């Protein structure tokens, strides 16, 4: 029996869909064409959770998400790291030797360049990896293949003719688990935690330098600091940051106190358990 619905951006069979299934096997994944629609589904309660990609070890941050996140009204309650693997799939009965063209989203084609070059395939760009599999299923073509996650082959009745064809095998995407709850239950104190927050410093000389000082003097490990322009204004820069620990920790509480003294805007977006993947070498 389903334990609720979880929103993601993309087609059924996408990497985000696989992440939903792996992390929340009892929930029903719900696909949305855009990140805006996925966020809206969470906010309205149509979906209880969201699985949102924020960065990839090769491609970098997902810019659309970082611009939506600070003003979304949602909270972060978890993170998941997912190794990314791409499969070459065809219509049933098609032999690899017959394939002349491969379709997928541009970033997937780029990350499988070695295999594509070795097989001497032409490329065709589509907006989503799973969409390439869906289109191939709907319009069978013995000369065409798709690059997509394994789940897409299962959903759309395709056959995998080459597995894990990505050039770099440490390709990993980080996802955030989102909720519309204003005050979600705090993570257990037995778990290492991450705190995500946004802030905008006051308009004064060296404000950012001074705002950051409390993290150094209190021994708080900041793992991420990224700047963004708000509403297209070059003078209204705000920052997204992540630190190890939780606001109840004395060291982080002191660092936040100093940060807020030099900031005109500050909001904690979430306190959540650190994924064990972080400790892997």
Language-model features: locations:
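Domain-level signature for soluble enzymes in the chorismate/prephenate branch of the shikimate pathway
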Residues: 1-281
């Amino acid at each position: 029996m389903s334990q609720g619905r979880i929103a993601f951006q993309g087609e059924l069979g996408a990497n985000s869909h696989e992440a939903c299934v792996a992390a929340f096997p009892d929930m029903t994944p719900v696909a949305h064409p855009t990140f805006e629609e996925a966020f809206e589904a969470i906010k309205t309660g149509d979906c209880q959770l969201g699985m949102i990609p924020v960065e990839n070890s090769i491609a970098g941050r997902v810019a659309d998400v970082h611009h939506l996140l600070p003003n979304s009204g949602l909270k972060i309650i978890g993170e998941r790291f997912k190794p990314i693997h791409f499969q070459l799939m065809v219509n049933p009965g098609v032999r690899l030797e017959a394939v002349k063209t491969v379709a997928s989203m541009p970033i997937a084609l780029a990350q499988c360049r070695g295999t594509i070059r070795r097989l001497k395939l032409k490329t065709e760009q589509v907006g989503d990896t799973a969409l390439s599999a869906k289109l191939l299923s709907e319009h069978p073509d013995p000369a065409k293949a798709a690059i997509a996650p394994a789940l897409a082959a299962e959903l759309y009745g395709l056959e995998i003719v080459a597995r894990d064809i990505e050039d770099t095998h440490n390709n990993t995407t980080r996802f955030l688990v989102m909720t519309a709850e204003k005050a979600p239950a705090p993570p257990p104190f037995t778990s290492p935690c991450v705190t995500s927050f946004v802030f905008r410093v006051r308009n004064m000389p060296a404000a950012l330098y001074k705002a950051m000082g409390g993290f150094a003097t209190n021994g708080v490990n900041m793992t991420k600091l990224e700047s963004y322009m708000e509403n297209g204004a070059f003078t209204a820069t705000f920052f997204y940051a992540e630190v190890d620990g939780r606001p109840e920790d004395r060291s982080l509480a002191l660092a936040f106190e100093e940060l807020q003294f030099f900031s005109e805007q500050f909001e904690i977006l979430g306190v959540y358990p650190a994924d064990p993947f972080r400790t892997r070498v």
